[in-house]
């Protein structure tokens, strides 16, 4: 009986190691394909990736003479009510810039061209 239990435990352990190796190899395959970016923009933004690219370009243009090669935006720091976004240049320099006038800022077709009609956080969205 002890021999059967020991063989069973080795079988379970071998299966777990095999499953772990398979999971690790699929993870590595995903990493080589590139990381999937998840943008958390409101639903009234029709193409989040396009907007993020445009904002990153604005951010880079603003600091084109900077020696730092690090430029980033953060979708959590977009203020659709005031039509601004946070641009990060390196670990210690942040700048608030204006969103382009054509940027949607509300669910009813509002744009940053008329900031008085823009809405902030929409409850339930």
Curated annotation (Swiss-Prot):
Induction: By feeding. By the presence of Borrelia burgdorferi. Its main location: secreted. Expressed in salivary glands. InterPro entries: Salp15. It comes from the Eukaryota. The keyword Signal applies. Coiled coil: none annotated. Residues 106-125 are annotated as: CD4-binding. Residues 1-15 form the signal peptide. Glycans are attached at residues 82, 94. GO terms for cellular component: extracellular region. Keywords: Glycoprotein, Secreted, Signal. Interacts with host CD4. Interacts with host DC-SIGN (CD209). Interacts with Borrelia outer surface protein C (OspC). Belongs to the salp15 family. Salivary tick protein that downregulates host immune system by binding to both dendritic cells, and CD4(+) T cells. Specifically binds to the CD4 coreceptor on T cells. This interaction prevents the activation of the Src kinase, Lck, and its downstream substrate Zap-70, and results in deficient activation of PLCgamma1, the repression of calcium fluxes triggered by T-cell antigen receptor (TCR) ligation, and a subsequent reduction in interleukin-2 production. This is Salivary protein 15 Ipac-1. It comes from Ixodes pacificus.
């Amino acid at each position: 009986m002890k021999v059967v239990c020991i063989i069973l435990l080795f079988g379970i352990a071998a299966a777990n190691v095999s499953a772990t190796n398979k999971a690790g190899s699929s993870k590595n395959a995903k990493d080589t394909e590139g990381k999937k970016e998840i943008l958390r923009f409101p639903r009234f933004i029709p193409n989040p990736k396009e907007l993020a690219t445009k904002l990153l370009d604005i951010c880079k243009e603003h600091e084109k003479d900077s020696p730092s090669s690090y430029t980033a935006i953060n979708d959590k720091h977009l203020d659709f009510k005031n039509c601004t976004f946070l641009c990060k240049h390196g670990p210690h320099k942040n700048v608030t810039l204006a969103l382009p006038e054509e940027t949607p800022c509300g669910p009813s077709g509002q744009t940053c061209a008329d900031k008085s009609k823009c809405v902030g956080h929409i409850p339930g969205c």
